[in-house]
């Protein structure tokens, strides 16, 4: 869910398409196809197709928002434009909580590929993930930030790995792997959709780019981005079911597919790619979350040469510390088998679903015509997927919403206090009277 460059220069169709694809692709593809197949079996393909349809609706809604509210700063800006300041604050907090809960999960994905190569159980995987998380946080503490070009290169690496794995493993297709089609019942498709949703966020990050595209370019860019993601997503999902089957270890599907494609070296290639993708993605997430934190923690102050200003904002070092603390706790729970990967993934998924819920709900008030209808459909679809995230994730969402509401109310009181302190002094009617 990386944020594109803020420059206002016009974009060409190829570069805009690359930025769109870069916002949609992420390291979740290293895990989620296998996780969905574990949850729903071959029927997980239905979840993929349904979410691709929902993704097309998201694309239309956020493109329309980008044109209707060109000055909005991403998801929180859209929520604020349609639903008000408190909704914008909640959206920022949900995004921030999604990054805090999601960063260690991404590191756990990378660690799974390392231990699939080197051997080791949950404790070893947790230790590798903790080391990876602390290393990335250390780089961020030192000021290292992934540029837009670096993020696009990481996406290109992921695409190459996926294409190689899918195409190379095709001789291993087994039709028998498609039966039984829904071994865990039809409701498992909803649970798989909730898991996969993490791979379909990103349209909101590139919506501001609509103002940098010339007339007629937007539909082409969205069409290219959607086609590329749909082909790769479905190709990977079909290959996971067709080639690996139910008996395989589906926590590292790309490693297994690459092993089928290029031989024993496939696991080493997958592990190396997973480490690079994990580090780059977490770094990009932290960069976006740091800016979000600065917006959230700007405290009104009475100091300043021109009246009310802002006190120094909360340091991003606090964010890194919180991510480290929360991350080590979550990784510890995973290492001790007190929380499975599905439960861990559901928390950031629910947070980002709430971000989408606030944006699409705002869109029903901002947009008109077919775009408003699409936004209403998106609201219903997001609510349906959110219902399958599990009570733990929904409880986490409620806690974050309560914190956001409290912070928003406190900020409102502070602003009113500052404003009252700088009211103009009225003339004394006795001294200055006519």
What would you call each of these model-derived segments?
Residues 124-172, 183-185, 222-226, 345, ...:
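Membrane-interface loop-to-helix entry segments
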Residues 1-34, 38-43, 56, 60, ...:
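Membrane-interface "cap" regions at the ends of multi-pass membrane proteins
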């Amino acid at each position: 869910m990386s944020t594109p460059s803020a420059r206002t220069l016009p974009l060409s169709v190829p570069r805009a398409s690359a930025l769109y694809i870069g916002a949609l692709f992420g390291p979740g593809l290293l895990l989620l196809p296998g996780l969905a197949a574990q949850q729903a079996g071959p029927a997980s393909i239905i979840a993929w197709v349904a979410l691709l349809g929902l993704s097309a609706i998201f694309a239309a809604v956020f493109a329309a928002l980008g044109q209707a509210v060109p000055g909005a700063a991403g998801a929180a800006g859209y929520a604020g434009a349609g639903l008000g300041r408190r909704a914008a604050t909640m959206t920022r907090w949900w995004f921030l909580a999604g990054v805090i809960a999601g960063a260690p999960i991404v590191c756990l994905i990378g660690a799974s590929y390392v231990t699939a190569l080197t051997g080791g159980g949950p404790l070893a995987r947790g230790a590798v993930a903790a080391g990876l998380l602390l290393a990335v946080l250390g780089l961020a503490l030192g000021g290292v930030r992934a540029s837009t070009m670096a993020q696009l290169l990481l996406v290109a690496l992921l695409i190459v790995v996926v294409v190689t794995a899918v195409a190379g493993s095709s001789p291993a297709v087994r039709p028998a792997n498609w039966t039984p089609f829904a071994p865990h019942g039809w409701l498992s498709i909803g649970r798989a959709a909730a898991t996969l949703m993490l791979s379909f966020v990103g349209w909101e990050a590139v919506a501001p780019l609509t103002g940098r595209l010339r007339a007629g370019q937007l539909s082409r860019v969205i069409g290219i981005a959607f086609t590329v993601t749909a082909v790769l997503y479905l190709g990977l999902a079909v290959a996971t079911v067709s080639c690996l089957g139910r008996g395989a270890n589906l926590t590292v599907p790309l490693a297994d597919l690459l092993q089928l494609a290029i031989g024993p070296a496939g696991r080493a290639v997958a592990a190396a790619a997973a480490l690079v993708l994990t580090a780059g993605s977490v770094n990009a997430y932290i960069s976006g979350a740091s800016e979000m934190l600065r917006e959230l923690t700007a405290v009104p102050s009475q100091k300043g040469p021109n009246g009310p200003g802002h006190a120094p904002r909360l340091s991003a070092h606090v964010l890194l510390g919180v991510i480290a603390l929360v991350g080590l706790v979550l990784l510890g729970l995973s290492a001790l088998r007190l929380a499975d990967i599905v439960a861990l993934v559901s928390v950031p998924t629910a947070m980002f679903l709430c971000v989408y819920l606030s944006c699409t709900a705002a869109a029903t008030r901002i947009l008109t015509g077919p775009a408003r209808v699409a936004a209403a459909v998106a609201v219903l679809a997001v609510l349906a997927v959110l219902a399958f995230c599990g009570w733990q994730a929904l409880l986490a969402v409620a806690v974050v919403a309560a914190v956001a509401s409290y912070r928003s109310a406190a900020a409102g009181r502070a602003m009113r206090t500052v404003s009252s302190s700088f009211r103009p002094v009225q003339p004394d009617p006795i001294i200055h009277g006519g």
